[in-house]
Design a protein with these regions (language model features):
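Long lumenal/extracellular ectodomains of secretory and single-pass membrane proteins
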Residues: 23-354, 368-506
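Intrinsically disordered, low-complexity segments enriched in serine/proline and basic residues
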Residues: 2-12
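Short, conserved loop/turn and helix-capping segments at secondary-structure boundaries
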Residues: 356-360
Length: 506
């Protein structure tokens, strides 16, 4: 009956109330308590500073619908936050950091487009629009958002900073990259960007730019082009099968397939080019390719789950082993902490989907490396057992989403020993009881005579914290770069902000 009433309360909340953010300025004078706000589940939470809320959103949002909010709402919140922050250089650097270090695309495209009206008069604006571009299609996506939301399509006006920055950004790309990201099937094509910004050709891209402008640029080297050519030239099914096998084999042996494309096409390679599986596995575990790929750790978990569905023959087993090894390589910088550590994972209803996948993966990684205690919580909290000698994926499998409410109080009511640090993986929406767990946290500290570091890891970027900011290190993001920041946190409380501010724009 209690759970039914709680669910009814949430439904009433969604119908009757709009989202309210009460943001506090970053680095204000410390007071006895932070500003209380209401989180998206209707419970109490502490508001983040505007800067921290922005960074959290940038590092966690893939601009898709979440349990408590839609992708369009996220973009509106992003615009509002960027306008509230007076330090525009920090906003710009945060966008670059999220795109370059964490591989976040759509959310940074939206922010870059919104900043066109906020960077007037800043000499470093052109440098921002250069540095926020990592791939050629970053420019087409930013322009697409800009045309849809920030200018009159019939008479579009493009800021000089954007045009100069994009023109310079073309210097990063060679003929292959330009031909790969022509975006010829999109409303905004790469040739449109060229015609708007007029980049100066270099030896790396002169031929491709010339062919692109004259609509003669063809890309025959990508995996899509190779497979398409096989389909067009095959005379029968047997011929098609051989041509596809040859195409995959050539792409893999010549290393002309991107790492992410390789990861996404492992199922096709197993089915269509079994002779190339061994070479594909060698690419998968190549340490240099993994580091350059910018593939987020949860992508390995997704690939592992998909391949696991294919059965148990040798090719499948070999690929699963390679994915496991690649995941381990991608996380060599996971910190080993001194003392006792508790990893706490939210398995409540709001964590369904990607947040749950991320929490279980990163929880397993931290647990394996640190041999620490693990707890899951929803309506209540419970300790979980695991074997640290198992693989990350095996450990992860035991930390599954279960649904239910989000009772943060239960964590510290259940904690039964002194911990030096607590790592909390959650979407930070604590509605059970409608109060923050600050009292329970204080009681825990008093009971065990301890003042632990608390790493509050926001997996959804909803904008509220379950503890006052000064009592925790607020983390966000899905990249293994978060672990680099964690290494600094116990020394430098503002490590994340320092990383962002260190980016050079002028």
């Amino acid at each position: 009956m209690t759970r039914i009433l709680q669910k009814c309360n949430i439904l009433v909340f969604f119908e009757l109330k709009k989202i309210l953010y009460i943001m506090s300025k970053f680095n204000t004078t410390v007071t006895k308590s932070k500003t209380l706000t209401e989180n998206l589940a209707g419970g109490q939470a502490y508001a983040q500073s505007n800067e921290l809320a922005l960074v959290s959103m940038l590092l966690t949002s893939f601009v898709n619908d979440q349990f408590y909010k839609s992708g369009s709402t996220t973009l509106k919140d992003l615009k509002a936050l960027s306008e509230k922050i007076k330090d525009k250089e920090f906003v710009a650097k945060a966008a670059i950091y999220a795109r370059d270090k964490f591989g976040m695309r759509s959310i940074t495209h939206g922010l870059a487009a919104e900043l066109t009206s906020q960077l007037t008069g800043f000499d470093w604006g052109k440098n921002f629009y250069d540095k926020v571009v990592v791939r050629p299609d970053d420019m087409t996506e930013i322009l697409s958002y800009y045309l849809a939301n920030n200018t009159d399509k019939s008479k579009p006006k493009f800021p000089n900073a954007l045009k100069k920055g994009f023109a310079t950004a073309f210097n990063k790309f060679d003929d292959y990259q330009i031909s790969k990201y022509k975006m010829s099937n999109k409303e905004v094509k790469l040739v449109d960007v060229v015609n708007i910004v007029h980049p100066i050709p270099t030896d790396r891209n002169r031929e491709a730019l010339n062919l692109l402008i004259n609509d003669k640029l063809k890309n025959t080297e990508t995996w899509e082009a190779k497979l398409s050519a096989a389909g067009q030239t095959a005379e029968n099914e047997e011929d098609l099968s051989k041509l596809k096998s040859d195409a995959w084999g050539e792409l893999i042996s010549t290393r002309r397939i991107g790492y992410f494309a390789l990861l996404r096409n492992l199922r096709n390679i197993i089915a269509q080019a079994p002779d190339a599986v061994t070479a594909a596995c060698e690419l998968l575990v190549d340490e240099n390719l993994i580091k350059r790929s910018r593939v987020l750790p949860f992508r390995f978990a997704t690939a592992y789950e998909e391949i696991s569905k294919l059965g148990s023959d040798k090719a499948v087993r070999d690929v699963l082993v390679a994915i496991n090894q690649a995941l381990e390589v991608s996380l060599v910088n996971v910190p080993k902490f001194d003392g006792e550590t508790l990893v706490v994972m939210d398995v409540s209803g709001s964590m369904s989907g990607k947040p749950s996948e991320i929490a279980s993966l990163f929880g397993a990684i931290l647990a394996k490396v640190n041999n620490c205690d693990v707890m899951t919580f929803s309506n209540d909290a419970q300790y979980k057992s695991y074997n640290p000698l198992d693989s990350v994926m095996t450990i992860r499998g035991s930390f599954r989403y279960s649904g239910g409410g989000t009772n943060f109080k239960a964590i510290f009511n259940k904690a039964n020993k002194k911990y030096d640090r607590v790592v909390l993986l959650s979407d930070m929406q604590g509605w059970m009881g409608y109060t923050t767990p600050a009292f329970e946290f204080a009681s825990y500290k008093k009971k065990f005579d301890v003042n632990p570091f608390v790493y509050s890891w926001d997996l959804a970027g909803f904008g509220t914290l379950q503890f006052p900011e000064q009592n925790v290190f607020a983390l966000a993001g899905f990249s293994d770069k978060v672990f680099d920041i964690m290494k600094l946190m116990e020394i430098d409380k503002k490590a994340l902000f320092n990383e962002i501010k260190a980016i050079q724009l002028s």
